[in-house]
């Protein structure tokens, strides 16, 4: 493929611009032809080689133009270009080899060469070294890695031999040391990505299971065995034909993704960012259907490729290690299994002989011996070879099912499930789990694939089982010991999202799967019903806590009635905590912990006292006052002071807050006179970033809007706001906030001072700040929805708002409400990835619910403010 102008006598530097102008469109046209062939489905491996060949020709012509034939210099391709692989926007790595004197003598000619190549449009990266300098530079194994894949472009046999000698194992990095360095580098790189490829925006090149892992294996093979590709290791007995074929297939899959990503992004982009995912999926032919988006199919294929590469890579790394260290004397374990250099090995050559019971016996041994480093490569390969022949649970015999349940009831059950999932055994035993393996959801709420999220949920359950207090989960360690059969919670966690992507309600469909599994594994009817109910209702506690007013006895009564028993409540609470915390590292926070704990205790009390006769309002008020009074008395306050402060607090306050919050509010009010403004802030939970802000103030137009705008400007996100009318025309505002960005310093005193300063001024001049929408959020835009309903027995209007999340959203909503002369009485703020789902209870300025005309005017104003288009 010609990509350069014809060779011609060198007219000197003056003609370089004309040469580059002629070469540039030829290179562009070559890329366009390759792009067309890519879209037609030609193998990516061939396209990479053709592009490298086109650039080779340009390089040779440019070299001939700029460098004299007798210069004593040679030109070599290194790195990926040296492998003969050149992606559309990748750097072109070059080495100019020559002795120092030759380098100095032709310094200007080399500068001219590099300038000419840049002028053509090639993103070159170059080094100019002597053989001795190559040896010195190769002390850095990353430099050696680039050099060992060198390919001569303009070099005679002597130059090629000099470079080979300079970086020979006898000179630098013998095979064993190189292997160890590369293995450590691989592990460190994996850790940078959280040791998983299942991120929302994975890195195709450097992420776990990515192209870099395959290249690392190739570098090790080249240094240790002198072979250019992994397929050559088949004949040496280090790689099976099936493994080599699988790696080649997955390499083509990832290379095609990367090639397309470079074209779509028009830059050397290695991460599958949201900016490009949909466009790339369309280009690669992934179409939407009723069950899955095309982009979700593309990402699932990537995640599965990465998982398979990691499985095979683990086996190869272990074999390379054995090549250097030799076979170890086995340490016998129970019958049929032993340890070799810490790796668990099945002793029989015929293991597992298609017997899933033997496979489960392997995992039982793994769980029983903490010293096991992993699975021996021979055993892992034997397992992989028979994996597809192992029966699923619904056709396996009763012995196999009993063995699986024994693993769930045995030690380190969650670790066992993780291992089974990674090795493909769990998906083979439960085919529905295989269906969600690698399945992503194209949103910002679910940051893991469904299978990885499920495993995260199980890990959280294991954390609860440890029985230690954890600052993230305030009461899980207290609830866990009450579980009659912990394995039932594991089953609920395993099945709660297993029906994702089938269409329909995944909770209901998953419950059907869970019931079938439990019955097949001979669980009792009661245990089966509990697991089935947990899967079907696994979202109920989260939705109730985050979207309903759990200080309302009717809400608690409905929830407790649904739950029915203390046992169900215990299991559901733990499953809900594990589920939310396993959805995203940022989703779980102190407020959610406290919210769920409050709902748990309220429901537990309702169940204890009986659902037929919930306590009347007056009794609840009396109990709240007495509990708060006891706390204040312990702080040294006398009854007269307590009575005076309680008289200044609205009755509704005693129904909405816990006794310790009431005591804090009442004690704070001692400092203020009627008509004055009080602002207090404190840490809601010790050693946590969550803050509670209490504002007592004369009612003023724009008060709520000014507070919200100030909190937003100071970098705090509001999770809950409660606004109550107090005696003497005062307002009780309580906000639960968390630092949202780096501008929030987390100091409650400074935040309170900032609010006091704002509230001392003209509230009507306070405006929401303007901030840019983060990159990720820009790709999930949709029209806002505003719905109205009655609340508080018809005395108020409830707004349910669903809109694309963005910085300052709540401040903008509060500003719209102020401009419409509306009063906010309650606000519940919930964010689910890119979606904000907020609820407000409002009235007009005369404390009346909104009529239809006012509702429509408010809807129009909110949509105009929040519509991303």
From Swiss-Prot:
What is the organism field in this record?
Xanthomonas campestris pv. campestris (strain ATCC 33913 / DSM 3586 / NCPPB 528 / LMG 568 / P 25)
InterPro entries assigned to the protein according to its UniProt record, in alphabetical order: ACT-like_dom_sf, ACT_dom, HD/PDEase_dom, HD_domain, NT_sf, PII_UdlTrfase/GS_AdlTrfase, Polymerase_NTP_transf_dom, UTase/UR
What the record says about its domains?
A: Has four distinct domains: an N-terminal nucleotidyltransferase (NT) domain responsible for UTase activity, a central HD domain that encodes UR activity, and two C-terminal ACT domains that seem to have a role in glutamine sensing.
Positions of the UniProt region annotated as Uridylyltransferase: 1-332
Cofactor(s) for this UniProt protein = Mg(2+)
Q: What does this protein do?
A: Modifies, by uridylylation and deuridylylation, the PII regulatory proteins (GlnB and homologs), in response to the nitrogen status of the cell that GlnD senses through the glutamine level. Under low glutamine levels, catalyzes the conversion of the PII proteins and UTP to PII-UMP and PPi, while under higher glutamine levels, GlnD hydrolyzes PII-UMP to PII and UMP (deuridylylation). Thus, controls uridylylation state and activity of the PII proteins, and plays an important role in the regulation of nitrogen assimilation and metabolism.
Q: Which SMART domains match?
A: HDc (SM00471)
Q: Which family does it belong to?
A: Belongs to the GlnD family.
Q: Where is this region: Uridylyl-removing?
A: 333-691
- From the UniProt record, list the reaction(s) this protein catalyses: [protein-PII]-L-tyrosine + UTP = [protein-PII]-uridylyl-L-tyrosine + diphosphate; [protein-PII]-uridylyl-L-tyrosine + H2O = [protein-PII]-L-tyrosine + UMP + H(+)
Span of domain ACT: 692-771, 798-869
Activity: how regulated: Uridylyltransferase (UTase) activity is inhibited by glutamine, while glutamine activates uridylyl-removing (UR) activity.
Q: Which Pfam families match?
A: ACT (PF01842), GlnD_UR_UTase (PF08335), HD (PF01966), NTP_transf_2 (PF01909)
* GO molecular function, a single term: phosphoric diester hydrolase activity
Coiled-coil portions? none
The EC number of this protein is 2.7.7.59, 3.1.4.-
Q: What keyword terms does UniProt attach to this protein?
A: Hydrolase, Magnesium, Multifunctional enzyme, Nucleotidyltransferase, Repeat, Transferase
Protein name, as recorded: Bifunctional uridylyltransferase/uridylyl-removing enzyme
